[in-house]
Amino acid sequence: VDGERDALDYEIDGLVIEFNDAAAMESLGEHGGRPKGARAFKFPHACKPTILRDIVWQVGNSGRITPVAYFDAVDLAGATVGQASLHNESNIHRLAGNCPQGLLGAGDRIMVSRRNDVIPFLESVLIPAQTLRFSIPKECPSCKHPVKKVGEYIMCSHPKCPAQISGAVKRWVKKLDIKDWGESLIDALCEHGHVKTPADLYGLDLVALANLSLGGKVLGKSTATRVLDNLY
């Protein structure tokens, strides 16, 4: 079946083998909510080699600073993949066990996959490049305050970090599915101090919002009116 997978007109990630007899299936019963007369099998993760180009440390709304690997895009299981989360510092050192200084570097030849044909994943380093290594940050990439280690994760120590504020607002907007509130608009509002918490969205002034500079242009009254209306 695995050899015929690519020729199918639809995506599959495995197969299920079961009795072709309803009475036999029922007589075998279940275990943990799963029928004993059936077995599911998953295909191995599709993997391809590529070249690591960059690591960007992103600040989440909780203050967690997560490394994201960017690499030459490859086609995997029907999707084009060009980036993958590295999760934390410990995972970087695990992957870079045979690399100079125990760190990843630009030009490293890596193996990437899509776990369960969904999640991009950096599996291993095949050949380390003879280049400078990507360092582990000592300060937050957003507010430049010192970082702290909490378990396996690096955290920003500044409670008013702009990236944390904008991250919390973006999460709120996404959760409520508020239309026309893009990331660039939220970033601009947080950068100019108009919004410090999600609650501040509901106290925005129409004039101030209309005069907000976004991408080299002011937002304008009609757009400002529309985005404010979409809050309710």
Task: Please place each PLM-identified region on the residue numbering.
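RNA/tRNA-interacting regions in translation and RNA-turnover enzymes
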Residues: 1-232
